[in-house]
Amino acid sequence: EGRETIFKGDACHIDALKEHIQIRQMIVAWSEHLHWSFPDGESAQWNQRYWDQGNLKPKASLDEAMRDFFINPDKCSLGCYTATKIVIIQGILDYFRRVKKDDAMADAIIKRLKSDDDVLVGIEPGAMWSFQKPINLDEQKRLGKLLKIQTQVAPMNFIPGDWVYFVNTDKDSSEKDGYEGSNSIYMGRASFDDFYNDNEHHYLYNEKIQNIYNWRNGVFSRSRHFQRMQILSAEQLHQFGLSPEEGGFLVKNRAIPYFFGFEPF
């Protein structure tokens, strides 16, 4: 049981597959050594040279602003939703700008990001959040600026560069700002990102599941609150790796990059 990734039309070409893999590799590469700060209920912080409360300043270069998140991580404090989008944008832009040296495509991506004057909003399709209730039908139909959706993905099915979402199903801890769930990038080798370097730059799959479960025990930092950590059994790890409809944490949706240059975006 898994999922299909279909390359059709102009994308039915080995070059489309190769480029898609390379873009995913770039997303993973930019997720590997992060140490941003988590706002933990406070307002996000931004480098004011480039950003005004999350909005790109009119004269700021988006290429420079994105690189700055990784060069000066101490100048920002970001939740996992924003952090995920930053890594994905940087991975895609860096691939076309620096690796492929396709400035025309990089500029087209920037134009797409700026199409509504809010570069960090809407890079993923609205259907990514189809599990949330009530459902806004217009939002569900909204296409992503840089990503499309794969639905009904089987448990344990991940491809490096996937945007994955884990829901915190515990009523009390999920009401704490920032702990409603976890936006994550799958890095390969059973690992997910660690935006805040709380666990040596990555979480193994079982660690990720245990992390989310233990929010109900007040474990909001694995490194600081490890004494409160409850270790889950193999049966519990299996259960919580299922979808929320089945009593688990893992949403069946995956947001993945378009086949840039081989399909409209």
Across the structure, where does each feature detected by a protein language model lie?
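Cysteine-nucleophile amide-bond enzymes
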Residues: 1-163, 167-178, 187-265
